[in-house]
Amino acid sequence: SKRLNVPQIPSPQWVAHASLWLPMLTAMMMAHNILPGLAALFSIAAGAIFTVQVYRWWYKAVLKEPMLWILFAGYLFTGLGLIAVGLSYWISSFLNLGVHLIGVGGIGVLTLGMMARTALGHTGNSIYPPPKVVPVAFWLMIAATVIRVLATFVSGTAYTHSIRCSAALFAVSLLLYAWKYIPWLIRPRSDGRPG
């Protein structure tokens, strides 16, 4: 919020706890087939909390900051994925949709976003503005997510091509990250500080 010069919007303590515990509880219940209907409701509730949080925290100025909007995107994909997983109790095809929203969109996008931020800081480089290749890597990861999610609605050759395209975009995104960041990660910090 300092970066955007906007007030920080605090979350109630119960929201912070629920966004942590509900997804874990859902996963444990689903893994052991314990009260699947209740697990579905927990998953939908968790996804709703994630999605509402994105709405509450959103400012248009976020769009100018790749290091911020990538985190919003990953958090939103995770929330939508949790909702889809919950709805799969009634519409079974939604499970595949939810798994890939969380797997590629949540884990893939958030991991790349956090690696990009933290590695800059820990190598003594400025987070803002990020290297020009970073937003490109971010967009490729988002494209990989969208294509992988859309692949759940097609079959045959279209499905195969979609999977390959998504995997290629995912890989290129991470390769761009590695290409830019590995030289920093194997050298002493740019600012000369220890670490």
What are these regions, as identified by a protein language model?
Residues S1-G195:
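Hydrophobic alpha-helical transmembrane segments of multi-pass integral membrane proteins
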